[in-house]
């Protein structure tokens, strides 16, 4: 992905219309990470590893089909298939587009559950059963 399009530095044009010279070349840390890659509901789980600031690595989720659902009454976790996204409090449009984010309510094989992890950051979907 070309990150030059996401540079948010100062303009190189003065208010009078004259041109300013560059103070320094664009550094990688000033480019940002590009547009957010929000995980979607798909046919299988697809993950990728990305290098982030400080030389660390993050496992990001691109597509998801399964979630680790915690059942409070039974005090156990199950791997359940995600059937659909019911709603998303952060953005109503995310539910229509099948984006999975923290706080989203998903319909699974065992019932409705709330996503408690951050799939784009953690690379896994953890949820708690609500019905």
UniProtKB/Swiss-Prot annotation:
Residues 17-30 have a biased composition (Basic residues). GO terms for biological process: translation. Disulfide bonds: none annotated. Coiled coil: none annotated. Residues 15-36 are annotated as: Disordered. InterPro entries: Ribosomal_eS8 (IPR001047), Ribosomal_protein_eS8_arc (IPR020919), Ribosomal_Se8/biogenesis_NSA2 (IPR022309). It comes from the Archaea. GO terms for molecular function: structural constituent of ribosome. One of its GO terms (cellular component) is ribonucleoprotein complex. Keywords: Ribonucleoprotein, Ribosomal protein. NCBIfam families: eS8. Part of the 30S ribosomal subunit. Belongs to the eukaryotic ribosomal protein eS8 family. HAMAP family: Ribosomal_eS8. This is Small ribosomal subunit protein eS8. It comes from Pyrobaculum calidifontis (strain DSM 21063 / JCM 11548 / VA1).
């Amino acid at each position: 992905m070309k990150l030059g399009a996401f540079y948010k530095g100062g303009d190189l044009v003065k208010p009078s219309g004259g041109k300013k010279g560059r103070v320094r070349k664009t550094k990688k840390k000033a480019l940002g990470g590009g547009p957010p890659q929000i995980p979607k509901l798909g046919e299988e789980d697809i993950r990728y590893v990305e290098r982030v600031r400080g030389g660390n690595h993050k496992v990001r989720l691109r597509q998801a089909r399964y979630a680790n659902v915690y059942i409070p009454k039974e005090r156990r976790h199950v791997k359940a298939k995600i059937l659909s996204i019911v709603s998303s409090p952060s953005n109503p449009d995310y539910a229509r587009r099948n984006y999975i984010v923290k706080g989203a309510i998903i319909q699974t094989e065992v019932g409705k559950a709330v996503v408690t992890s951050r799939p784009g950051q953690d690379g896994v979907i953890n949820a708690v059963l609500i019905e």
